[in-house]
């Protein structure tokens, strides 16, 4: 919102970046705003204020446009009567960890209120809040590539009726419960879709819609096995001590005063925020990931 100074800060930042980098086009180049978790509301609001700068929108493990459940925990920004994201391709990715029908409903309602919006949904089944698997990386990359091919530097507004539809997965009204049902109706061109249009989402083309359906078919009926694997009190370790994560095939650093020194081994290190932050200094997050099988 301009009242917060964010818009001015962004514009000054891009001018400064253009000057420092020598790339003058940075002041006008199309942008893909990307936000995660508490910042996942940002991409929608950025596009509403900067539609002529926005190539595509990606809200990752986040929320819907104009949601009442902002990840940062306070009220959303009011867009007013004239702002919208009509024709701007948008991708909302929700992991199974944070899946909640109350997160999806605002997106469905938004599409009814703004029928020219182009919102895709990917249920990142089996995923937690901080992990990002190769399949989802490739999915987001393909989405952005296809948007560029259709919009380019002209940033023409897309017509949703030129895309495809696919239904939304269904879950519980209790946050974090496993997905209860994936869409059974096959994806189809926008005007030929035979499922409920009020519970479906837009996809930029056939390949993207079928890829989404294939992701759902691959996980449908399998058991979700997200579990806490370690609760380590770092106060009992010294700088330089290491610990090993036994579970899973791969382990990744998320945050905290540790660094990865082996395939699944981490070392305690001095932390940028110091040692007197009660929330950050003495705890760390790591993720251990295992590929699914026929049942999980």
Locate the predicted segments by residue.
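Alpha/beta-hydrolase active-site loop
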Residues: 2-25, 31-33
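Soluble non-cytosolic domains of exported or imported proteins
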Residues: 4-8, 37, 101, 131-134
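Short beta-strand immediately N-terminal to the catalytic nucleophile in serine-hydrolase-like folds
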Residues: 33-35, 60
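Short glycine-enriched nucleophile-adjacent loop
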Residues: 40-51
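The feature captures the conserved acid-bearing segment of alpha/beta-hydrolase catalytic domains
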Residues: 55-141
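Alpha/beta-hydrolase-fold serine-hydrolase catalytic core, especially in secreted/extracellular enzymes
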Residues: 117, 125-256
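Short, solvent-exposed secondary-structure boundary/capping segments
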Residues: 265-268
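Intrinsically disordered, low-complexity, charged/polar segments
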Residues: 282-294
């Amino acid at each position: 919102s301009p009242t917060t100074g964010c818009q001015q800060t962004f514009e000054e930042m891009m001018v400064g970046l253009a000057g420092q980098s020598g790339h003058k086009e940075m002041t006008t180049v199309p942008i893909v705003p990307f936000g995660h978790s508490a910042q996942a509301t940002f991409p929608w609001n950025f596009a509403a204020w900067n539609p002529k700068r926005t190539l595509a929108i990606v809200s990752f493990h986040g929320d819907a446009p104009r949601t009442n459940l902002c990840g940062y925990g306070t009220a959303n920004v009011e867009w007013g009567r004239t702002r919208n994201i009509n024709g701007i391709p948008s991708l909302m990715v929700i992991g199974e960890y944070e899946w909640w029908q109350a997160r999806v409903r605002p997106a469905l309602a938004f599409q009814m209120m703004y029928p020219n919006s182009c919102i895709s949904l990917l249920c990142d089944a089996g995923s937690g809040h901080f992990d990002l698997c190769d399949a989802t990386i490739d999915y987001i990359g393909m989405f952005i590539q296809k948007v560029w091919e259709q919009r380019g530097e002209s940033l023409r507004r897309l017509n949703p009726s030129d895309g495809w539809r696919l239904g939304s997965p269904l879950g519980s009204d209790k946050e974090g419960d496993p997905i209860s049902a994936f869409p059974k109706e096959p994806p189809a061109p926008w005007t030929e879709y035979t499922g409920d249009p009020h519970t479906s989402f837009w996809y930029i083309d056939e390949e993207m819609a079928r890829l989404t359906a294939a992701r759902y078919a691959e996980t449908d009926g399998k058991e979700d096995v997200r579990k806490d694997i370690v609760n380590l009190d770092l106060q009992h370790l010294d700088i330089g001590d290491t610990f090993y994560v036994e579970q899973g095939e791969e382990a990744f650093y998320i945050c905290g005063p540790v660094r990865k020194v082996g395939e699944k081994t981490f070392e305690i290190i001095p932390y940028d925020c110091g040692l007197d932050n009660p929330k950050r200094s003495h705890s760390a997050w790591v993720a251990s990931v295992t590929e699914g099988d026929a049942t999980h």
